[in-house]
Amino acid sequence: MAGHSKWANIQHRKGKQDKLRSKMFSKLAKEITVAAKMGDPDPDKNPRLRLAVKAAKAVSMPKDVIERAIKKSQGGDAEDYSEIRYEGYGPNGIAIIVETMTDNVNRTASNVRSYFTKYGGNLGTTGSVSFMFDRVGEITYKPEAGDADTVMMAAIEAGAEDVESDEEGHWIYCGDTSLNEVSEALEKVLGESEEAKLVWKPQNRTNVDLETAQKLMKLIDALEEDDDVQTVTGNFDIPEDVAAKLDA
């Protein structure tokens, strides 16, 4: 399947989220600060900020931390961050997109390049792999939101373009510019979503073997542990039998 990736769930099972929890908070706080600085500090009047706050709440970020991040955007000493996308190939030619938010472009470029080189990849130029992905909105619901048919009908009515459902939940996709609109329409029918965000959705995914999966995880771990990196996306998936060996 080209949309929802099983490897995100593998990361959860490996306890990786606990390890990255503090980093996740700092990355989300950075996104909140930038979103608030670029627009209105009121989430109700700023779609990007509203989505950032929603993402923070989804991982139980304390309310005072969220408010502090918004307040920071209004101060005269708020850092200026540049949003830069890096593209390249990981082990076995897997396409990877890295989104960063940095106050030092040279540092970030050097670090990202070194991770690709160290872990069997090759950093390319902007546009070198993004043509293999679609920029879309992704809205996530837990299985309890309804059965696949119910969610599909609600998604169509809300203006979504695609839906994927399995035993772990529902993933609803829409145009990148209509994420806020579709998310609000769905909320009236299905209740509040677990997450709503912009993603790079691979047009096709490649199932990888154990050796490739291990190499990819090392590269992705290194990237995600960098404070300047916000998201990492690849056009691969890890079959369940390989995932079981990764967990071992």
From Swiss-Prot:
Residues 1-21 are annotated as: Disordered. Keywords: Cytoplasm, DNA-binding, Transcription, Transcription regulation. GO terms for biological process: regulation of DNA-templated transcription. The keyword Transcription applies. InterPro entries: Integrase-like_N, TACO1_YebC-like_2nd/3rd_dom, TACO1_YebC_N, Transcrip_reg_TACO1-like, Transcrip_reg_TACO1-like_dom3, YebC-like. GO terms for molecular function: DNA binding. GO terms for cellular component: cytosol. It is found in: Cytoplasm. Its main location: cytoplasm. The keyword Transcription regulation applies. HAMAP family: Transcrip_reg_TACO1. Belongs to the TACO1 family. NCBIfam families: PRK00110.1, PRK12378.1, YebC/PmpR family DNA-binding transcriptional regulator. This is Probable transcriptional regulatory protein RSKD131_2012. The lineage of its organism: Bacteria, Pseudomonadati, Pseudomonadota, Alphaproteobacteria, Rhodobacterales.
